C-alpha cells in the first residue's frame, strides 16, 4: 500500500519490481502456509530430503580432492 501513496516517478520502479516479485512471493507464501497448516510433520523430512542431495555432491567433491592431495604430499 505504501507504493501506491508515493508519487508516480518514485513509485514506478518500486511498483515494477513489486509486480514482478509479488506473484512469486505470494505463491510461495500460500504454498508454505498450506504445507505448514496441513502437514507440518511431513514438511520437515521433505525439506531434509531435498537439501541432502544438493549438499552431498558438494561435500563429496571437496573431501575427494583433499584425500587425493594428501597422499601425494605424504
From Swiss-Prot:
Record GO biological process: nucleosome assembly
Source organism, top-level taxon: Eukaryota
GO cellular component, one term: nucleus
InterPro entries: H1/H5
Compositional bias segments (type: Basic residues): 11-74
UniProt-recorded Gene Ontology molecular function terms: DNA binding; structural constituent of chromatin
Keywords per UniProt: Chromosome, DNA-binding, Nucleus
Spans annotated as Disordered: 1-74
Tagged with keyword Nucleus: yes
Predominant subcellular localization, coarse grouping: nucleus
Localization (cell): Nucleus; Chromosome
Entry protein name: Histone H1.C8/H1.M1
Taxonomic source organism: Trypanosoma cruzi
Record lineage: Eukaryota, Discoba, Euglenozoa, Kinetoplastea, Metakinetoplastina
